[in-house]
Amino acid sequence: MDAQTWPVGFRCLLLLALVGSARSEGVQTCEEVRKLFQWRLLGAVRGLPDSPRAGPDLQVCISKKPTCCTRKMEERYQIAARQDMQQFLQTSSSTLKFLISRNAAAFQETLETLIKQAENYTSILFCSTYRNMALEAAASVQEFFTDVGLYLFGADVNPEEFVNRFFDSLFPLVYNHLINPGVTDSSLEYSECIRMARRDVSPFGNIPQRVMGQMGRSLLPSRTFLQALNLGIEVINTTDYLHFSKECSRALLKMQYCPHCQGLALTKPCMGYCLNVMRGCLAHMAELNPHWHAYIRSLEELSDAMHGTYDIGHVLLNFHLLVNDAVLQAHLNGQKLLEQVNRICGRPVRTPTQSPRCSFDQSKEKHGMKTTTRNSEETLANRRKEFINSLRLYRSFYGGLADQLCANELAAADGLPCWNGEDIVKSYTQRVVGNGIKAQSGNPEVKVKGIDPVINQIIDKLKHVVQLLQGRSPKPDKWELLQLGSGGGMVEQVSGDCDDEDGCGGSGSGEVKRTLKITDWMPDDMNFSDVKQIHQTDTGSTLDTTGAGCAVATESMTFTLISVVMLLPGIW
């Protein structure tokens, strides 16, 4: 035997000798037990036995041999055993909880950035192309994107209503500045009449319906995805602090602290013994496993479907193009709309007015024309893919939790002497049961009774969110429009195939990075050269300036409401 292996072998022989001595003669002093009791802050050592004695009043740590425990110590040990169990659960779930919570925060932050960027693009459209109506349109643009954010983050707002509200407010501006320009009626009553007439005269054609369809395909899945992540955090928080039954508490005490009473504080339980105790204590939690598995699978399916026309970045960052198309369509049908408005609202009392124009800040030209996330290395779709790849590792988390705790934390290694609940033995000889409530009928260590109502509530929530996730996942071969209230429009069906250009690839590392590349198809400089542009001259006539581009940028609108909206899990 060489110099390196001798100490290891010697220690093993010494341990076996000590174990044999403890089994045959019992512990001679309680000094080490007293020290550990004090070190764990379980109570004062005053009154604790100095040497082993009979323990007739013990309820769980019963032994024929003299003991270092009193009834008071046993009660303190039982509290410590429950606390240890909760600590083990929290430690085991901490990585999973961190994965979900950090990614939920990153997704929310990225969506907020998308919304602000889309709002900025729409503001730039008005300031560069429809300057005379830009300041009047600012409030409607801000309100629209605030509503988008509120809806995404769980507020009770109706997408159909805020889309209609935006186009209702846009029509009076288009009418006064493009259809009947130059001199306008300044009365609120006449503008309100024009606003109310929008849905009757349809100045923007089917574009409002197209916007509703796009919002339905992109906003609702993203909203549901965020809410589902929030529920995942709630499930983990709940299971981290489960109440353990009396039978479980007694079994934990017997497994972890009864060896202390015999002076065997460093002895670990046998693997089979540990599995029986932990599988019994966590039997109800194991019932979550199939529902947790379905939850992760449904998240994956929804994530895979959220690309192409279902990609929220594509929809939001192209919203300004649909607004421009809507204004152009109304301008092209100006004469017809003029007659319809005159018929509905009458002819206005015409008074000369001067519309306020945008105030430009040349120093901020580049600031507004570039996306703030252009230097990022990944798309939002890739982030979802990486997150799901990491989350897949936890599909059987609740089904294998008892085994994980015994293997990683609690049980003795194979081949070492271990505690079987009564004494130090070479191996555990009782039957080892499986996971789940049904398997516990033959558990020799823990009696499992009834059904845990808290676990049942979690199961019901998981079932419900799985239904929501599956309901928001378009079919891969034939996607259907998600209904929004009573509205919505006809949309084309598109393929659900996912390729690299869709941004569906991912490394699967799950590492959280604070900056996200929102799109890989937006130019570095937002360019309006392809946008049909109509500028109003000082004389009231209109001038086509297609290709002129946007010379300056405006500050993005403030978005304070979204920052304070929390995810709302209470929809279930």
Curated annotation (Swiss-Prot):
The keyword Calcium is annotated on this UniProt entry: no
Protein name stated in the entry: Glypican-5
Region of interest (Disordered), ranges: 355-375
Main subcellular location: membrane
Entry superkingdom: Eukaryota
Organism (species): Homo sapiens
Keyword annotations from UniProtKB, A to Z: Cell membrane, Glycoprotein, GPI-anchor, Heparan sulfate, Lipoprotein, Membrane, Proteoglycan, Secreted, Signal
Cellular-component GO terms for this entry: cell surface; extracellular region; Golgi lumen; lysosomal lumen; membrane; plasma membrane; side of membrane
Function noted in UniProt: Cell surface proteoglycan that bears heparan sulfate.
Glycosylation sites noted in the Swiss-Prot or TrEMBL record: N120, N237, S441, S486, S495, S507, S509, N527
Tissue specificity as recorded in UniProt: In adult, primarily expressed in the brain. Also detected in fetal brain, lung and liver.
Pfam families listed in its UniProt record: Glypican
Signal peptide residue numbers: 1-24
Family to which the UniProt record says this protein belongs: Belongs to the glypican family.
Location within or outside the cell: Cell membrane
GO biological process, one term: regulation of protein localization to membrane
Topological category with respect to the lipid bilayer: Lipid-anchor; GPI-anchor
